[in-house]
Amino acid sequence: MVSSETFKSCVWLSAAFVLAVAWAVPAAAKPQNPADLCIGAVAKQEAAHGIPRHLLRAISIAESGRWLRSRKATLAWPWTVTSGGKGTYYKSKSAAMRAVRKLQRRGVRNIDVGCMQVNLRYHPKAFKSLGQAFDPRANAAYAAGFLRKLRDDKRSWTQAVKHYHSATRSLNRPYHAKVYKIWRGERRKARKIQIANNRLQRQQARARFQHKRAERLLADNRFAARSQLWLDRASKRLFKQ
């Protein structure tokens, strides 16, 4: 028969496996947060243009960063419009586009838009339409290409970041300091996430091993139980004789 201690051990090992697998299963899908549009688009363009990891992300946060209480973080916001030094975060792409058109009807041309706050006055040919300007993929792609060109021209990522904002030294030096502070923070967070992921993978591997061990123990004990049952029946037949 299966001993109570062995049975408890098998149950515990199986439970550990189920718990580890549950950690790895994503929660039910939720509506995508607009900030995630910037995150995905920026990460893709960093890789495509050979930009140091998280640097373009840091610039996006410096440009259109918005504190999100639900995420407890400042993240780039795709529906951001800045004019006259004042940035406004809109709830939707359509609302942001209406705001830009309203500014343009008033004769305002110096307007920054989207995740990377591309300036419509200084980059008039960047996008085919205002709708494309607010497309996070197109916005990040143009900004990444512009930053890469600055890097190639200036031979320095430091200078590229400065000139992404302005060629004026008194303006670009504080901007560079701000971006690099954000960049250091983003790299620290990325390292912590990687460490946590590695730990989770080890826990899952350990749980899988324990689950297989539990299955073997259960199989062995089922065989032992069947053998014991056969012996009991054989003994009864012998006694009857």
Residue ranges and their predicted role:
Residues 30-192:
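Catalytic glycan-binding domains that act on GlcNAc-containing polysaccharides
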Residues 1-50, 181-241:
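N-terminal secretory targeting signals
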